[in-house]
Structure formats: C-alpha cells, structure tokens
C-alpha cells in the first residue's frame, strides 16, 4: 500500500510538471506561477504590505509586527460606460487556494472575492517595481499597473518613508471613444473595535483611515492615507451604513452605475471610503492615473526584541 501511495505521488508530480507551461528566467509570471506571489511594498523599517501576482493587496503589516493573514477589503476598480460587463476590480482572478480556509470563511467572509475581475493577467518583478498587466474581452481597456517602493540607493532616509506608489495605465483597445471612472475603495481596516474612536478624515484628492488610541492602549492609534494627484478626484468619505454586507454591496452598486457619490468626512464609525477619477479615452489613446498610500503608526504594542 505504501509503495502504491509513493508511486501515485511521483506520477502526480511528474504529470503536474509536464502540464505546466515552462517559465523562462526573468520572464513574466503567468498562470500557476502567479498564485503565491507576495511582493513587499513599503519603506525600510516602516512596516509593509504586499502586492500579489494578481494585483491584490495582502499581508497588511503596518502595526510593528508581521500580519501575513491580514488581507483588508481594499481594491481599485474600473467602470466603462455603456458596457454590460464593464465594471471590474483591477486584479486577476482570486487563486483557488485562497477560497478555502480563510478567516471566518464559514460566515461567507471573503471581502471582495466574489466581485468580477479581469480574466487575463501577468506579473513581473523588477525591484523596487512590480508590474501587473490586465486584459478582458468584455472590457475595451487594457490596464498596466506599476507599484513601487521608495527605494533609492545611497539615500537611506528617503528609502525609509512609509509610502507606496501605484501608477495605472489605461489603453483604449476599441475604435470608439470610451468614458470611464477609475475608483479606489477601502473599508476602514485601521479600526480596532472597542478601542478608541475610528473615523475617516479628509485629505487632498483622497481620504485618511483613522483610529485613535487610548490612555491604556496608545498603540491602537494609526492613520492610513489613500490619495491621487488628480484635481478631478471625487471622494466619498462615508459608505452606506448597514448590517452584514450592505456597505460593500452598496459600494459595488455605485461602481456598476458609474455613480460618484460624495459624503462628508469625520463621522465616527464610518465603515469605508471611495475616491473616483472620471476620464475619457479616444480610440487607441493611453492615459495614466497615479495613486499614493502613506501611513503613520507611532506606537508599538511589542515588548520584546
């Protein structure tokens, strides 16, 4: 019986190897090679998160310790006016291995995993840059995302800033003018329930996810800012408040309809926020939209090391 099991495992391994598309040295990652990529983003010693092979963000570890299972609900999306399936998260499909065993998965939790994504994608690493390319036959726009770290050789100070940059390149592949809305959407993942106050504050062309500390737990304090350099940016600082999955569902409804809703900042208990950048592409035209993230967590809960 043991021999049969060993033979079966060897056969399976050989079959898997033969069925896989061979990847050349330093080439793009595609297909199965993208499934467990986690490219670190963040300045030296400032905490970090990762961009995955699909373009998703995970491993959110900005509170002075690794938190590799922390995948907050935050995502970029595109809405193309006049296309039935023209609203997509700017990521490749969720890998199968992530769909089972996720925290609280018995309750149906999975963040944005059930929302439509681009079908074709690839990943390429050129540290400090990570590049994700996206395409889908239902969307007349090809997308290239370049994410980068503040890594500057011989400049350790600026290389140690708690910031990250994302540049989205949109190319109109159709023969018609395309009207679209880029958005970035995030729940307030800085919130620590029962500890201080959580709210979402205003920033120029963006928003700040905030959590205050307390006298006994100052380490709960933290800010995470998401913003663009585009003056046409519209910001919704306060998602719909409801039970279960209502806030995210209403957020997605707004995206599908191309609605750029505006709500004021500073309301305690705000669930999430979105920013929107409308744009138009002529046939064959390419346009870039830049997004930035920065964070500040001044106190640590760690007592060792």
Predicted regions and their residues:
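Primarily extracytoplasmic ectodomains and periplasmic/lumenal surface modules that are beta-strand-rich
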Residues: 44-48, 53-59, 175-179, 189-190, ...
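Polysaccharide-binding surfaces and accessory modules of carbohydrate-active proteins
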Residues: 150-254, 302-305
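Short Pro-Gly-centered flexible turn/kink motifs
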Residues: 48, 178-180, 279-295
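Extended, loop-rich substrate-binding clefts of extracytoplasmic carbohydrate-active enzymes
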Residues: 99-163, 240-275
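C-terminal motif of bacterial Sec signal peptides marking the signal peptidase cleavage site
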Residues: 12-13
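Sec-dependent N-terminal signal peptides
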Residues: 1-8
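Short, hydrophobic/aromatic-enriched beta-strand segments in well-ordered soluble domains
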Residues: 134, 145-147, 182-186, 287-297
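Beta-strand-rich N-terminal accessory domains
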Residues: 17-97
């Amino acid at each position: 019986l043991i021999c049969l099991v060993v033979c079966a495992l060897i056969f399976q391994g050989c079959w898997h190897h033969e069925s896989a598309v061979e990847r050349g040295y330093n080439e793009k990652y595609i297909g199965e090679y993208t499934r467990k990529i986690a490219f670190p983003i963040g300045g030296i010693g400032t905490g970090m998160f990762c961009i995955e092979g699909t373009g998703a963000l995970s491993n959110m570890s900005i509170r002075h310790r690794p938190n590799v299972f922390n995948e907050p609900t935050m995502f970029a999306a595109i809405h193309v006016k006049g296309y039935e399936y023209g609203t997509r998260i700017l990521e490749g499909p969720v890998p199968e291995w992530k769909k089972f065993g996720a925290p609280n998965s018995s309750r149906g939790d999975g963040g944005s995993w059930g929302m439509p994504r681009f079908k074709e994608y690839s990943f390429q690493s050129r540290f400090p840059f990570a590049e994700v390319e996206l395409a889908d036959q239902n969307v007349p726009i090809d997308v290239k995302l370049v994410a980068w770290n503040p890594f500057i050789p011989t400049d350790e100070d600026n290389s140690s800033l708690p910031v990250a940059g994302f540049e989205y390149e949109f190319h109109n592949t159709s023969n018609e003018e395309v009207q679209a809305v880029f958005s970035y959407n995030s729940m307030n993942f800085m919130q620590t329930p029962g500890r201080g106050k959580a709210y979402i504050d205003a920033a120029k062309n963006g928003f700040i996810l905030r959590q205050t500390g307390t006298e006994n737990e100052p380490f709960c304090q933290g800010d995470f800012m998401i913003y663009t350099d585009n003056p046409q940016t519209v910001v919704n600082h306060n998602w719909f408040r409801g039970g279960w999955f209502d806030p995210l569902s209403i957020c997605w409804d707004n995206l599908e309809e191309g609605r750029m809703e505006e709500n004021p900042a500073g309301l305690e208990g705000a669930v999430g926020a979105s920013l929107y950048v409308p744009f138009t592409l002529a046939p064959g035209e390419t346009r870039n939209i830049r997004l930035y993230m920065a964070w500040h967590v001044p106190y640590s809960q760690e007592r060792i090391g």
